[in-house]
Amino acid sequence: MKQVFLFLGLSLLMGTIALFTICGYDQIGTLHAAPIENVALNAKTPFAEGCSKCHATEPAYQEWQHAGHSHALVNLIEGPYEVQTSCLSCHSSGYEVFSDRVYPGHTYNIETAVNAVACSSCHSHTSKEEHLLVKPAKKLCVNCHKMDCGCAGAGIVHQSQSEMFLGREGAGVKRMPSPHVRAMKKRCVHCHMAKEDPETVAKHGGHTFIADFSTCSTSGCHDSVDNNMETKLPQYRAEIESKMQAVKKILDAAPDKTSQAYLDAKLNYDMVKGDSGYGLHNIPYANALLDYSLSLKSELE
């Protein structure tokens, strides 16, 4: 009987090791490099993820291929900012793991990175969270979608989805969280990952992360004719865009671009612009920020 249990135990262990090896994960469930002797398989780096070996035909992987996350590394390299290795923490899966590990002759940096924001940025085989997430859903996206990532440089707003959603960090405006902060316990995934059929490849939601505003009505939250988000959102966007143009005109004409009034007005403008362009994660806060910037016009002339 002991021999039977020993055999079963060894079989389970070998199966687990095989699973992690195939998927590109080590025994602690984090992304790991291919063996150094296999570097020839990838002339650029041994750090590539291998999730597509098993998941390439699944809807989640196919959706991700067309999502912004799959272009994160290319966007970084070809973007307008000076690229630093630390930028990889949000633009390339594996940086947080490999930056602390030494592989002879293979440093994880902007020249050797090949992964975009791929599977291991959000998932781990050893996680006890729902969907094997590395963190609870409400805490995951804000790791990168925030102002203080440092990629763009000190004082430059790179992106501001988190701060806009929570309604904070702007100049001259009291804290104003979006009503969705309380209503949506899982935060971002409610809008950006909602999809009707998990077994089909979607154009919105899922791993496309493209918000489908029709769900605002079908969820029962905005189901009245006067409160239809598919109709109202373009109106909100046009209003915010008009204010942004007015603020930009004032900023461009300001003679002193070092004054506190200028810095405050520009911060608010950059926050709204950094929130996917139009502050749609918190429309009342976006309007309040721009209104305050417009109120500084006389001080900026």
Features from the language model and the residues they span:
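N-terminal Sec-pathway targeting helices
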Residues: 1-9
